[in-house]
């Protein structure tokens, strides 16, 4: 299985880069992992809805350049479906059994995802009703994908 993370913006903090590198290494025995960072747009303070829509659309165009037609696309959205770790593992496992060979997880920028990206999504996933920094969300997502593969493989993992 190939897992791709498409994210908006670059990681600057060393501690986050280290955590991403650690989970990338751990995941290498379960899947082929690719992380793609697309450039983010600067959002002016007090930006209007129209300006924010334009920013989301620009970032969305950059994201969609990397989305393959045959990939199963999961967008991270505050209004998405909340799953337990076991349910996420089951979803990944079922997709593989059904013949899906490529899952793309998309994490938007600070103001979310554009309409075209949301239209292309096969599944909207939420980790919480709370808002998290998109940089930290990468680490949380990678940890949950790693946990999913441990569950699928019936291997122990901290609960």
Where do the language-model regions lie?
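S-adenosyl-L-methionine/SAH cofactor-binding core of RNA-modifying enzymes
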Residues: 39-101
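N-terminal beta1-alpha1 ligand-phosphate binding loop
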Residues: 1-27
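Short, well-ordered alpha-helix to beta-strand connector turns
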Residues: 31, 70-71, 121
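General small-molecule cofactor/ligand-binding pocket signal
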Residues: 6, 34-36
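Short glycine-/acidic-enriched loop or helix-start segments at secondary-structure transitions
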Residues: 15-17, 84-86, 115-117, 136
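Structured adenosyl-cofactor binding patch, chiefly the S-adenosyl-L-methionine
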Residues: 115-159
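Short glycine-rich anion-binding loops that position phosphate/pyrophosphate groups of nucleotides
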Residues: 11, 78-81, 109-111
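A mid-sequence interfacial segment
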Residues: 86-128
